Amino acid sequence: KTFGQPPYKFLTNMRLDFAERLLVETDYTFSEVAFLSGFSSQSHLTSTLSRLRGMTPAKVRKSK
């Protein structure tokens, strides 16, 4: 808890940060972004991003 949160939450947030960066800075598909950022599937990325950040991958990408 060095970062004030359990390790799994810290890692999830790091993966989401990386996924958001890929969505904004690349033209990778949502499935590719999910795989590259450590999510098991596109739907896992979408549900986690929606639950924790309140945005879908498409909305993140449109915010370029």
Across the structure, where does each feature detected by a protein language model lie?
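Key DNA-contact positions within bacterial/archaeal DNA-binding proteins
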Residues: 43
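…primarily DNA-binding HTH/wHTH and HhH modules…
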Residues: 47-64
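Terminal helix-turn-helix DNA-binding modules in bacterial transcription factors
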Residues: 1-40, 62-64
